[in-house]
């Protein structure tokens, strides 16, 4: 895996914690049987070759986005840096929302981002559904030990009895039922003898706890739904807050790294692990949960509900629309894996919520592409320029560096002819002050070509300038002796009209015009940027091989890539990745 140049180090509060754990030998004696399992299995294992174990645990109910990329980079990066292993685990405990399509897409996205979960001869690709038998066995053990009970209240009754931040909850009438009675009901739940929502398994903790999450949280609920992996084998499914610590412990995770919304769940996480370890079900040392602030970007929404609405209502062209914050959208836009890793490395890992300006993501891809992207010329808004004193039918070769940062890349060659395409913005009939490009009587250099002097222009019936005339100075060709004898203040790019390659170019910009589209009571759809996609018919420098994924810096314009979906050899389609400079004011 090739990484971008090392960025300035961003703070990461987790690093000192891990270093302290390793220095104190907190995981010394930790055993690993080569696969996840309970204490009895791990006791048969060898000392764990991984110094630490982390995990990236997506739910397979959608496509990964830039926020997930941060979590991926944090978990895989810490494991890499400290001689550990990062697991890819699918938290597939909600059968009504999960699909194999998303599993496949997540695997592809994590691989594309540059990370691998194979280590020490193990695949380290896991599914929560692989642990359903363990979870159920542990649930029975908790019931028998008096730590859990089956509640027959409705969801509304449970909610009403939970209390508030200032008032304690009320005990369920089923809280003190005998353990064998709860065990019987739990087995009936598993055997499909009760309808959805009729019974739940709850932990017996403390209904007066100041932390509402410890007021007998629900662990299992009845759901007669087909699971994408287990089919109809189960009709009870674990709640995430119960499954999460069990999964971590079975996999020997040392540092369970979550986003801040799970901070209030940590006491329940610790309670579950402690009770199951006391019962001999889970091996010590136990995992510890740490929370960091999720990545929030200006001009972006990452809510699955809102992204789905954008797709379903046609505001974007699917999940891989180049304006979407999904990893597939960013990939199609032309963002490289190394640019996204670079961006994530430049953002701090902290416990304080903040918003990162979108310009930092754009700058990361500029910094990543600048040293490697070949240069070329494109004209996006073409205007004909005729060199009136240049012979008709004549063509000569001009040359330019493929990449000024890499002399080994060599030069590119392209023809100069009588008729050229230039940008509309490079001519003014009546120029403003400090305008140094073409206007009647002014002299400019055609970059890599000749110096020319504007002699006239032609308008159509509507008054639009459709052609500019100029004369060239024969002794001023770039790279020849005496070429700099004529001093000019303006340089403009061009392509030969007879040789240029026609292409459709999508000029993508930020999807939202508001820096905080999901803030407060805003209608996020009202914040959409009406200019987030503009399509133009452009002319490209000849010699460009428009294969999907090929990327260039078009001089003066920005970075562009060949669209992976719509481009064809006979009809190239390109996407603008990013402009050369930030054109937005800081949010």
From Swiss-Prot:
Major enzyme class: ligase
Q: Which GO terms describe its cellular component?
A: cytosol
Q: Where does ATP bind?
A: 59-61, 65-71, 259, 294-295
Q: Which InterPro entries match?
A: aa-tRNA-synth_I_CS, Gln-tRNA-synth, Gln/Glu-tRNA_Ligase, Gln_tRNA_ligase_bac, Glu/Gln-tRNA-synth, Glu/Gln-tRNA-synth_Ib_cat-dom, Glu/Gln-tRNA-synth_Ib_codon-bd, Rbsml_bL25/Gln-tRNA_synth_N
Q: Which residues bind L-glutamine?
A: 91, 240
| HAMAP family cross-referenced by the UniProt entry | Gln_tRNA_synth
- Report the protein name in the record: Glutamine--tRNA ligase
Organism of derivation: Bordetella bronchiseptica (strain ATCC BAA-588 / NCTC 13252 / RB50) (Alcaligenes bronchisepticus)
